[in-house]
């Protein structure tokens, strides 16, 4: 996590088959924040022909999308948030979300904000059946790949390939245009969204929170500049959140090094492997915010009780181990939430 910027289809099927299978009963329009979803009959989401995914062992985009279809088959709603076409790209790729059939206080799961962090999207694909089962017990909103072009070309941001101390990359999760300025709460931190993608994603979060208010949010990240990970807890309980503590235990049990104290490389204090709420203008801060500014007007924010961001070390671990750690984390948390939804 950096200040301000944290830091379709079954296997082997042809592209034509991919496009024919990836269908949504409802296409979510990108209108004003408070607008209702716009329906379209049998709207089709397409992955363009010829999309090549960075070859480091991560699943191709087509295989990720194949896993999402299993949720659609289980009755989940597939929403098109935006068609992403960042600078330097020639084709648009869909940013999608999936919602379990029954609305209500929900578990939100996000991944793929940073394109050079593939473990989360791959773990979500492997955990689809577990997430489907969780959706039978609790409302769930899944944003499985928020930066598809970044994933395909191994770029962290929409406009920069790597984190930089001297340049602010445009993250798809930038929320500064909706979050109050701490020094002047009546004004947002930025006058406009940093990109069309950030605008669309944050509008989706605000709008969807009406029917699926986030109770618990889980955001999967990696950091290739550290050898020990940690968990951000942006919610009400901070470092005392029992889910954050359980997550630290799961990661340690799985052999993932966790920094238990000291500070992150951004100067944030770590207590038991957990960092309490920070002001970073991320989508996670937005999901936990009790008050936001939309079109210049203050309104209640999504107000999630628990907002967890997992930063696992990528520097010295092969991808398969990183995916396995994220998969174990998802399965354990899904099982815990299904058994004890009061958490």
Map each language-model feature to its residues.
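Active-site/substrate-binding loop(s) of hydrolase catalytic cores
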Residues: 104, 118-127, 132-249
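C-terminal accessory segments enriched in acidic
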Residues: 1, 8, 17, 21-22, ...
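N-terminal cap/lid segment of alpha/beta-hydrolase-fold proteins
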Residues: 75-90
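General small-molecule cofactor/ligand-binding pocket signal
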Residues: 79-81, 96, 141-143
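Short beta-strand element of the alpha/beta-hydrolase
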Residues: 106-111
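Bacterial N-terminal signal peptides
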Residues: 22-34
